[in-house]
Design a protein with these regions (language model features):
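Non-catalytic alpha/beta scaffold blocks inside enzyme catalytic domains
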Residues: 1-90, 97-278
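Long, low-complexity segments enriched in small/aliphatic residues
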Residues: 267-323
């Protein structure tokens, strides 16, 4: 129907629309109803609401993210928004709801089992050394590796893996298969009961607690879903002077196992500003990191899709083709 598809947006900003259009035309309603659990009438009613909205935001949470077909499902949500140009338009867009306040920040900092070559290369240049290029495990593969005895040690920095992973039985089995299970935590949780051969519970400071190191009180940074980066500093006295920060715990583990020839781990523990100075050497969007944090509310990292700039070889938004 005329006016249903934003042809100007697709012509100027998108690719693979014709292939996607053909796939949709070839898909039978019986198949759609069987997969969705909804009737054609119900879907048509929802589509009518969408068609009469000038701007639309699609929001989803962990039920989609941890779905068996999560990637394809999210790609279809993106396709849905591309059809009417609901990216890079005021009041429109995509809004994933994460299960933790700093999940997006973790990804930005490179916590990824398959980091991009450019990210690794930038670290190698900064450190003047060679780093491993072999991909690691995502959660699913990590659990399977523990069960198969291909991995022996599990170190969890925060969170509650036993309750958060989607297959509870397999998660329990994997954690109990460990030679060593280390939990760095602010509070007791179910993961501490899945022990394995040996287990350590390492209490750490929470974000509300004062973090005092050699150079004085420290703060960390977080990135929210809307790409805002800001400082987070506790103001409550720690429950004990013996409780260490996450950074101190990880830094001391690294110092004990890797040594300090390449990285001065103790210097990073003593002054978190030095960590941020290293980050800005690897990630250009964090230039003048410490200085920009002085602005009230932090700073905006930017979102290329919001500006309708597409950072891929085609330089265009791509309709995903999922059979």
């Amino acid at each position: 129907k005329p006016g249903v598809i934003d042809t100007d947006f697709i012509r100027n900003h998108a690719s693979q629309f014709e292939q996607y259009k053909q796939l949709v035309h070839d898909t039978q309603w019986l198949s759609i109803e069987a997969q969705s659990g909804l009737t054609q009438q119900e879907i048509t009613q929802a589509a009518d609401v969408y068609l009469h909205a000038n701007s639309v935001i699609c929001t989803w949470a962990m039920g989609i993210t941890q779905h068996r077909h999560s990637v394809a499902t999210i790609q279809e949500i993106v396709n849905f928004q591309l059809l009417r140009g609901n990216l890079g338009k005021k009041g429109a867009g995509l809004c994933p709801v994460r299960g933790h306040s700093n999940v997006q920040g973790n990804r930005t900092m490179g916590i990824n089992e398959k980091p991009l070559p450019g990210f690794i290369n930038a670290q190698e240049e900064m450190l003047n050394t060679t780093l491993p290029q072999t991909p690691g495990h995502n959660v699913y593969h990590a659990l399977n590796a523990l069960i198969a005895k291909k991995s022996k040690v599990l170190i969890c920095l925060g969170g509650n893996l036993a309750a958060a992973a989607s297959d509870t039985h397999k998660t329990f089995q994997a954690m109990r298969s460990t030679e060593l299970n280390v939990q760095i935590s602010t509070k007791l949780n179910r993961s501490h009961l899945q022990i394995g051969k040996s287990a350590l519970i390492l209490p750490c400071l929470g974000r509300t607690e004062i973090d005092m190191q050699a150079s004085g009180e420290q703060f960390i940074t977080v990135e929210d879903t809307f790409s805002m980066v800001h400082a987070s500093q506790g103001d409550v006295a720690p429950i004990s002077n013996n409780v260490k920060s996450e950074i101190a715990i990880v830094g001391e583990m690294a110092k004990s196992t890797l040594g300090s020839k390449i990285i001065d781990w103790q210097a990073l523990i003593d002054d978190y500003d030095k960590i941020r100075e290293m980050i800005e050497q690897v990630l250009p969007q964090f230039s003048s990191f410490n200085q920009r944090l002085e602005s009230p509310g932090g700073f905006y990292l930017g979102n290329s899709a919001r500006e309708r700039k597409w950072h891929n070889p085609a330089k265009r938004a791509l309709f995903a083709i999922n059979d």
